[in-house]
Amino acid sequence: MEPAAAAPAQRLADPTGEDRAPAAAAAAEGGRSPDSVLSAAAPSGGNGGAAREEAPCEAPPGPLPGRAGGTGRRRRRGVPQPAAGGAAPVTAAGGGANSLLLRRGRLKRNLSAAASSSSSPSSASSAAGGLPASCSASASLCTRSLDRKTLLQKHRQLLQLQPSDRDWVRHQLQRGCVHVFDRHMASSYLRPVLCTLDTTAAEVAARLLQLGHKGGGVVKVLGHGPPPAAAPAASDQTPATELGRDVEPPPSSSTVGAVRGPARAPPADLPLPGGAWTRCAPRVNPAPSDSSPGELFAGGPCSPSRAPRPASDTESFSLSPSAESVSDRLDPYSSGGGSSSSSEELEADPATVLTGPSGPPHHPVRSSQPRPPSPKTSALLQPKAPTGVDGTGLVVGEGPGDDKAVAAAAPGVPLWTPGRIRETVQKTSSPPSLYVQLHGETTRRLEADEKPLQIQNDYLFQLGFGELWRVQEEGMDSEIGCLIRFYAGKPHSTGSSERIQLSGMYNVRKGKMQLPVNRWTRRQVILCGTCLIVSSVKDSSSGKMHVLPLIGGKVEEVKKHQHCLAFSSSGPQSQTYYICFDTFTEYLRWLRQVSKVASQRISSVDLSCCSLEHLPANLFYSQDLTHLNLKQNFLRQNPSLPAARGLGELQRFTKLKSLNLSNNHLGAFPSAVCSIPTLAELNVSCNALQEVPAAVGAMQNLQTFLLDGNFLQSLPAELENMHQLSYLGLSFNEFTDIPEVLEKLTAVDKLCMAGNCMETLRLQALRRMPHIKHVDLRLNILRKLITDEVDFLQHVTQLDLRDNKLGDLDAMIFNNIEVLHCERNQLVTLNICGYFLKALYASSNELVQLDVYPVPNYLSYMDVSRNCLESVPEWVCESRKLEVLDIGHNQICELPARLFCNSSLRKLLAGHNRLARLPERLERTSVEVLDVQHNQIIELPPNLLMKADSLRFLNASANKLETLPPATLSEETSSILQELYLTNNSLTDKCVPLLTGHPRLKILHMAYNRLQSFPASKMAKLEELEEIDISGNKLKAIPTTIMNCRRMHTVIAHSNCIEVFPEVMQLPEVKCVDLSCNELSEITLPENLPPKLQELDLTGNPRLALDHKSLELLNNIRCFKIDQPSAGDASGAPAVWSHGYTEASGVKNKLCVAALSVNNFRDNREALYGVFDGDRNVEVPYLLQCTMSDILAEELQKTKNEEEYMVNTFIVMQRKLGTAGQKLGGAAVLCHIRHDPVDLGGSFTLTSANVGKCQTVLCRNGKPLSLSRSYTMSCEEERKRIKQHKAIITEDGKVNGVTESTRILGYTFLHPSVVPRPHVQSVLLTPQDEFFILGSKGLWDSLSIEEAVEAVRNVPDALAAAKKLCTLAQSYGCHDSISAVVVQLSVTEDSFCCCELSVGGSMPPPSPGIFPPSVSMVIKDRPSDGLGVPSSSSGMASEISSELSTSEMSSEVGSTASDEPPSGALSESSPAYPSEQRCMLHPVCLSNSFQRQLSSATFSSAFSDNGLDSDDEEPIEGVFSNGSRVEVEVDIHCSRAKEKERQQHLLQVPAEASDEGIVISANEDESGLSKKTDISAVGTIGRRRANGSVPPQERSHNVIEVATDAPLRKPGGYFAAPAQPDPDDQFIIPPELEEEVKEIMKHHQEQQQQQQQQQQQQQQQPPPPPQPPQAQAQAQAQAQRPFQMDHLPDCYDTPL
């Protein structure tokens, strides 16, 4: 609902004026994090200045993004490999030009390069300085941001920190950097501000206001607290060039960031408009007396002496937004075109530029010794002669003693003396302010004495960082803005209470249409909140604005004019405006939006989530308001500005009935609301209230009073005057007993005291409250109920005691109880009175005895699952109205026969018990849902399916069934069974004919039985079948009669012996077909695939060979999985680990999980696996999938401690999620295998980290060992932490109704209740470790860890094991998306590293690769790159397997191939390297063998768009002429070369060569290079990403394809088609390049002749002695040197 607003004329700014640029930028910002722009850098003091001078004169300082010294665009790089000395290598920016692909702008996947080149040339980069010496310094510049919306922002500049700035920060832990969005600058900079923990918000704001529109670089504002004792003197003598980096190239114009003054306390005064001064009343601190990190959100001052440290559970406090405000706070039109400033913005924070006088600068007289601070300075601040810190926050000297105050000043830089500040303050209409924004939501103005750096550090500690130096490094990353951001001045996007929805310039006419006087004129029209605003003159910045209230009015179509609407207001003085729109689209948009506004009630106003500090003036235009929503703001009772309206003005609304002030961080009860006698509903939840005043008794008409989420311990006795109060919310406070005043509130019928601190419940207090019927005491710490000889409590009908610590519960005293909740306690016995009992919830206890007396005749729902019951109580069978009975997960051995005779029973859940059989002789039963899975049932009752004529659902999986009972004894049947789950039994072929007795069967799961055939005649009768799963049997074929099942949409038959491809492609409705792990050799496809087919899985069929036509047809499927070509066998040594993964969609066929599998992470010595679960969102899992490996690689270079690098990886990932993580979230688990970093020759270490419900289980000696932990409200420490943060836990156990997990990635708007800090556990791998499993939430909700380990322990293939887990979970009742990764281990006693990894080691010899004979991959070095390149151990090792057509080859080469320079030449012409000694763990990595490694160009980009695929690219004509396809996996990181050999053996490329990393050239030679299958090379076409992860189903066009001759068919080969030469298969040369190409070809022919001569000379020589096989392969590769286009000019650098 939009606010009723009418803006006065003077409050509307010109949309085209100067205020529009920052307004639009702030609106586009939306809390998003602008990514770092990485470009080539030179060492400080080197050619950085030259790079700056090369920038255009009209541009701000710094080179173009991605350029250095005139070089072309660069791709993003990963973390630079540290050199021997620990410093990152810095490559000089060499000359070079872009390739043809880059010149044509078709490198669309590398969005970072495109964004850099298209952005304003004023973007600053790091070219002026040097790359940081440590890897941690460059981490923020090397990884990508997942905030893709940042690309849409215009006029956004980013000033980056130089190495000198970072060194200054690292010099002391008291220093840091905050990134401030400087609204005062015309180009809207995100400016880094270097400061200390003592720097106040007033100082920072005033310094930025001082710079104003002049621009500037990095600003340094030093605080005035006591300096550290160990601070070196040199740190204060920083040169001017390091203190500030101005936008102008000449150094003389650089601005000093700050001038140090003496230590003193922060000011408490603020200058007010007109130059007046007043004492600013600080806001009441809602937190406890000790300063806590939570004060950053509550507005409390931070102690300057408190050192930053990790926030403990008892100290941290911050309020979370309510769950209902998640969806209503987004306003995409806020501060859009024509946005106006709000009243409080113009009154409190105008964008006035702070300028100094025009006279010469005044330099104070220096003295040899500084004067100590005056004790009076911290107590008082005189307005006439301010010292130390001016009211504007500018740092000044105090007099002659300030020697060090100006020591860092550069010559020619004016200093701000007290005299100049007073003169400036008189010109300033309001004090400068600094604002803080969390998670892109509401923005709070910081008090003058608050410390921005302290606030930022406390926030990062709350996230989970444990070390101050790491918090310091994280604060220097600009991407932190998506989590916490500072603004200099109130941002327009959050400041406007009249939210702009639509605006534009249209033809407007006022009055009646028939009057000829009113002609059409072009005017600015704005739909703002609930008002239509029309400018009176053409230039909307001048003249008055006409405001037309729309609530109660009407909007009508004008038929006489095209695209014309008539807007009319209500009331006797209604006016009408006719607006003619330019297009029909705009016409419809305005019609729909205004129609909604006009239909609203004029008495209701919604101003929630508007960052209001005081009530806007237009709110008081109408005194007839009845409903006012002001939640999620920062309203104050007494604003500091005199013209502002505080909460005291609310009493002017004499008709107000409903007022919502929740989540306003008030700290004290707003006493003004007690003067509103008409108020019937008041919500002051989550305001850190510690007491309720006695004046509330005056609100005698109040009916609903919400006080949840505060610090209340008592209530005033005056509440008894609220005779009409019917609902009082006291949940999540600090009550230890029931307040006595409730005894007199006779209209209150529900006691809401969940989440308090009650340990005992005195029933005597409830006896004195006969009006209470519903008692809610969940989430307390109740241990016992004290009766005190109380009679029966007949008035209590509903009792909720969930999540307490009760051991026994005797509820017989509640003789009229109807609903009892006692889940998740520690109950052993439970006694209940059953007279009126209707529902019993007692799951997740330890019950062995359950007594209900008398028999509950009204009981309809009973849940006693997950207890220790050994039998079903007798009284259950006598309960005649029982409809749902859940007795699962107990120890019940037998079900009584009378239970099935209950005519009311509809649903019986008895799974996970010890049932050996069901009652033999069943009478007719009304059960519709019967679940008896996970028992020991050998056979079902013979008459079960005949008597249960109402049965629709039967799940008997995981039993010992060998046959099925018949459904009928005749041909006719009355069965209505629709879903039948019989997975994991011992059923044989004999039971298949019995299935025909269920003609209405829709879902049939018979996986993992003993089926050998499925008769065709029986399949033909199941015409209604929609889903069938017959995996894990011994079937050799699927009957052709499956074509009769016209409604079939899912066919799952993996892990069989199927040899013939079934007729599933004839099914019109088929969507998913899984035939993996079979023995298919060929497939038969129709001319046209089924229109709805989305997934086809053919992996694990080693004999399958596809021809080109079939492959071309199958590539049109959204998710087509097939085995990858084998990666050449490197050494024949057994692998230590191999993996298989699978995933399945959940409801609505939506895949919300993702997997990550990197077998050769970080140079083949490590492995990385992960599973990510987004619950119901798709975005977060895929963002985690493509980024976490990069982050982990960077963190490994910063620390070697297992827990620390894993924790930091998850926390940094929280930042990398960007705006996607503000509203969405996802669970994650990562497993990292590596050697001990200290002892590389030692055993392997497996480190697992998880958040959410994704978990890891290790099988050791056949027993499960859990390596994960699920953090929910059932965890005692988590429950305590959440309750301290006053988050609201809903009845389903979710934080603010959003998520059950209290530790999870994303959901940053729930901070600090929900944090990303993971659980980390490390184990040393031993020969007894067989495998480990990573699974998503759906897997572990359906399978226990013991069952999962037992199920796959004897499955030899990792892929088949993962498939089995997924199938079992689905058959056991999982409806969520599932992902499972199984990693098999082969750790032996001698599993230690014996590789010679020294610098003087030798390179391994080459060997045959995977490429076809007519294709060779030539990796060229990039001498023109000035960026530090990522090492092969940068953690981005992965598997590249994706697909695109030949016409799209050109756009994919640049994006999927790595731009990392190789360790050695990969072409067959590269010199032979001597053999290197390797251990079995690290086999020899051959130069032509394929080693999967991530392309840093693809996944290290800051703006990589995961949504782009090859269909988005434009084909380049002239590259290929035929349409043949051959899948090629690019070998880019196979060699581990030593530094000395790298310099010797790299390909020699001319300096003018393009930076294109891969050249694919055709070769006429054919050689029968053998290919061997790798056990871990189970992949997909269109499903595997370059990091080995599983991409979304839509992204299925990522494989690099080359036009070439097809390989000959071999056993186990990939294709079955012979070579098909095409006469048109030739290179097409553009006419303008013919002459140049001729010269190149001529030069090439000369080289070939020279090579032939050399070969002839070698043949004349005597034959050499016999060579080993590897040397022979190397010589053969040398002889088959392909045509390398190394010497092509830049314009002809297209991969051919």
Curated annotation (Swiss-Prot):
Per UniProt, what is the membrane topology?
A: Peripheral membrane protein
InterPro entries, per the entry: Leu-rich_rpt (IPR001611), Leu-rich_rpt_typical-subtyp (IPR003591), LRR_dom_sf (IPR032675), LRR_domain-containing (IPR050216), PH-like_dom_sf (IPR011993), PH_domain (IPR001849), PPM-type-like_dom_sf (IPR036457), PPM-type_phosphatase-like_dom (IPR001932)
Polar residues composition bias: which ranges?
313-325
Q: Cite a single GO MF annotation.
A: metal ion binding
Q: Where is this region: Disordered?
A: 1-97, 222-398, 1422-1473, 1610-1696
Q: Place the motif PDZ-binding on the sequence.
A: 1694-1696
Q: Where are the LRR repeats?
A: 601-622, 624-645, 655-676, 678-699, 701-722, 724-746, 836-857, 858-879, 881-902, 904-925, 926-947, 950-971, 976-996, 1000-1021, 1024-1045, 1047-1068, 1069-1090, 1092-1113
Keywords for this entry? Answer: Acetylation, Apoptosis, Cell membrane, Cytoplasm, Hydrolase, Leucine-rich repeat, Manganese, Membrane, Metal-binding, Nucleus, Phosphoprotein, Protein phosphatase, Repeat, Tumor suppressor
List the cofactors.
Answer: Mn(2+)
- Reactions catalysed: O-phospho-L-seryl-[protein] + H2O = L-seryl-[protein] + phosphate; O-phospho-L-threonyl-[protein] + H2O = L-threonyl-[protein] + phosphate
GO terms under cellular component:
cytoplasm; nuclear membrane; nucleoplasm; plasma membrane
The PTM Phosphoserine maps to S378
Q: Which annotated residues bind Mn(2+) 2?
A: D1173, K1337, D1376
The Low complexity compositionally biased stretches are 79-92, 1431-1452, 1647-1660, 1670-1680
The residues that hold Mn(2+) 1 are D1173, G1174
GO biological process, any:
regulation of JNK cascade
Compartments where found: Cytoplasm; Membrane
- Co-factor remark: Binds 2 manganese ions per subunit.
Subunit record text: Interacts with the nucleotide free form of K-Ras (KRAS) via its LRR repeats. Interacts with AKT2, AKT3 and PRKCB isoform beta-II. Interacts with WDR48 and USP12.
Tell me the domain comment.
Answer: The PH domain is required for interaction with PRKCB and its dephosphorylation.
**Could you tell me what this protein does?**
Protein phosphatase involved in regulation of Akt and PKC signaling. Mediates dephosphorylation in the C-terminal domain hydrophobic motif of members of the AGC Ser/Thr protein kinase family; specifically acts on 'Ser-473' of AKT2 and AKT3, 'Ser-660' of PRKCB and 'Ser-657' of PRKCA. Isoform 2 seems to have a major role in regulating Akt signaling in hippocampal neurons while isoform 1 may promote Akt and PKC activation and inhibit ERK signaling.
Q: What is the name of the protein in this document?
A: PH domain leucine-rich repeat protein phosphatase 1
Natural source organism: Rattus norvegicus
